[in-house]
Each structure stands twice: as structure tokens, then as C-alpha cells.
Amino acid sequence: MTNQQGRLRTRVAVFACVAAAALIVDQLTKAWAMAALSNGQTIRVIPGLLSFTLVRNPGASLGMGSGATWVISLLAVVACVALAVAGVRTISMKWSVALSFAFAGALGNLIDRVMYADGFLNGKVVDFLNYGWSVGNVADIYLVVAGVVLVILILMGEPFSHKDLIEQSDESLQSEPEADAK
């Protein structure tokens, strides 16, 4: 096995393990919420900031798109495939970990849409983390955090692929003679 193949296997293993662990946490917290909050009760955790309230959300973030649940579900399928492919193709462990959390979040909510469906891809996501202005779940937290981390990686110039790495090397080589001339 070459060094490059070994690094690829490591990234794939990390992606799979992080995504699986995150997905398990998401699904266990939703199972707890459905069992503990099924009678419509609210549990106050931090008064004014966080409570647990069970909500079945047919839409996307903040309940948007509740009339187009199947479209949201199809987009989630596409997102899961794209995130898995990107997570395996990247050369960066940082990108791989961030993408694994995004994948776990997208897949966690997609699982809800399939398991709690009124028809083909017409299900509802289990939300229970009530912030007062929004109700979400652990998968939503993964998606938000992954999004922030991905933006940071882009802004930091973290190479995603070999092409990015080569372009960065070429740019640094081109800027060195300019620096030497000054």
C-alpha cells in the first residue's frame, strides 16, 4: 500500500467513524425526546434560553418549506451523496471531519423524514431543542457548526484537493521571486 492510499484509508475511516458516532448521538437524542416529551410537556433546561419541547417539523430550517416536504427530502438525499463523496475525495482531514458532521446532520434529518413519513419522502423531522425563537435538534447543530467550520476552512485557504494544493504551491513559488526582488 502506498503512503497516499494509507492516508486515503485513514480519511475514509475518520469520516465514517465521526459520521456514525454523530448520527448515533442524533438518533438517540431524538428517541429520548419522543419517549420523554410525547405527552406535549415542556422541560425547562435554562429558563428563557433552552427548553425541551417535541415538535414534528415537515419543513426545513425554521419550518420553511413545510408544503414541499418531498422536495426537501430529495434535496437531502442529493446533499448526503454529495457530502459523502466530498468527504472521501478531500485530501484534508479538517475538511473530512467537517464534512462528516454535515453528512451526519443531513442524514439524521433524512432518516426522520423516511421513518416518520405520511407518504413517499413526506415525513417530518423530530425537533426538540427549543431556543424560544426556533426548535431544532442535534442534527441541526451539526449542520450549523459544519457550515461555520467549512467557511473558516475556505477563508483560511485549507486545500480541499490535490489541485488546490498544487495551485497554492504555484502561487507561493511565484510570490517568492517578487519578495526576493524587494
From Swiss-Prot:
It is an enzyme of class 3 (hydrolase). Its EC number is 3.4.23.36. The chain crosses the membrane at residues 12-32, 68-88, 91-111, 135-155. The active site is at residues 127, 140. The keyword Membrane applies. It is a multi-pass membrane protein. It catalyses: Release of signal peptides from bacterial membrane prolipoproteins. Hydrolyzes -Xaa-Yaa-Zaa-|-(S,diacylglyceryl)Cys-, in which Xaa is hydrophobic (preferably Leu), and Yaa (Ala or Ser) and Zaa (Gly or Ala) have small, neutral side chains. GO terms for biological process: proteolysis. It comes from the Bacteria. GO terms for cellular component: plasma membrane. Its main location: membrane. InterPro entries: Peptidase_A8. One of its GO terms (molecular function) is aspartic-type endopeptidase activity. Keywords: Aspartyl protease, Cell membrane, Hydrolase, Membrane, Protease, Transmembrane, Transmembrane helix. It is found in: Cell membrane. Pathway: Protein modification; lipoprotein biosynthesis (signal peptide cleavage). The keyword Transmembrane helix applies. Disulfide bonds: none annotated. PANTHER family: LIPOPROTEIN SIGNAL PEPTIDASE. Belongs to the peptidase A8 family. This protein specifically catalyzes the removal of signal peptides from prolipoproteins. This is Lipoprotein signal peptidase. It comes from Bifidobacterium longum subsp. infantis (strain ATCC 15697 / DSM 20088 / JCM 1222 / NCTC 11817 / S12).
